[in-house]
């Protein structure tokens, strides 16, 4: 069941859930619980010029973005991680990409909360 969000394709999640709404609710719940903190870590590290810290935090969220079919977000976080690993040569560009990423992810969070609520109603 693909969502209306252009950067959210839950096909893989639904496939491995194999009909288990509980798995879907739990997976979405963990993502929604952990991701804001990781995004805050990235933001703080970028603001502080801590490129190694920003890259490490970006790496932590990258797999989850792929898991939820957030391909644009995954591509952006990969670019951010690479730019930070390279020493943050262009901080303004990194910040702009991060701001773009957070806007996209905020939309996905909203949609994921809706999906989670729908699935919880089935439990």
Region locations from a protein language model:
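Short helix-adjacent coil turns
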Residues: 42, 46-54, 68, 87-89
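Helix-loop "lid/cap" segments that line or gate small-molecule binding pockets
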Residues: 11-18
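Conserved HATPase_c
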Residues: 25, 51, 55, 95
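An anion-binding catalytic pocket shared by soluble metabolic enzymes
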Residues: 61
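Active-site flanking loop/helix segments enriched in acidic
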Residues: 19-23
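Amphipathic, coiled-coil-like alpha-helical segments
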Residues: 2-7, 27, 32-33, 38, ...
């Amino acid at each position: 069941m693909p969502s209306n969000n252009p950067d959210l394709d839950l096909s893989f999640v639904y496939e491995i859930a194999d009909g288990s709404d509980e798995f879907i609710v739990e997976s979405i719940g963990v993502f929604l619980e952990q991701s804001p903190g990781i995004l805050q870590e990235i933001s703080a590290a970028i603001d502080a010029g801590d490129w190694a810290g920003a890259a490490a935090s970006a790496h932590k969220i990258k797999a989850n973005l792929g898991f939820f079919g957030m391909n644009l977000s995954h591509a952006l976080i990969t670019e951010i991680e690479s730019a930070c690993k390279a020493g943050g040569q262009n901080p303004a560009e990194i910040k702009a990409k991060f701001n773009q990423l957070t806007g996209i992810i905020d939309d996905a969070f909203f949609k994921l909360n809706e999906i989670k609520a729908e699935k919880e109603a089935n439990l």
